[in-house]
Amino acid sequence: MASGQEKGRSELDSLAREGQTVVPGGTGGKSYEAQEKLAEGRSRGGQTRKEQMGEEGYSEMGRKGGLSTNDESGGERAAREGIDIDESKFKTKS
């Protein structure tokens, strides 16, 4: 007889195979396990980038990205609205 954890996992796997996202950050995975791996990789990728740029540069880059819309980039909107974005912080640390 399957344990409760195995049963829950198989239910999540069948939902994932139907195209639903069952793991936060696992969008696009065709199975529960695939979604777990995608979410883990995305998280690790963000952490690596944060370490490369430093806390300040990473948050500054997020500010610029948050300003973007379908019509214009974050840089264009920042310039138009007079928002100061310090791109010197974007450089990776050596």
Curated annotation (Swiss-Prot):
The gene is EM. Keywords: Stress response. Belongs to the small hydrophilic plant seed protein family. It is thought to provide protection for the cytoplasm during the desiccation stage of embryo development. It holds the Pfam family LEA_5. This is Em protein CS41. Residues 1-16, 33-53, 74-94 have a biased composition (Basic and acidic residues). Induction: By abscisic acid (ABA) and osmotic stress. It comes from Triticum aestivum (Wheat). Residues 1-94 are annotated as: Disordered. InterPro entries: LEA_5, Sm_Hydphi_plant_seed_CS, Small_hydrophilic_seed_prot. It comes from the Eukaryota. Disulfide bonds: none annotated. Wheat contains at least 10 different genes for Em protein. One of its GO terms (biological process) is response to abscisic acid. The keyword Nucleus does not apply.
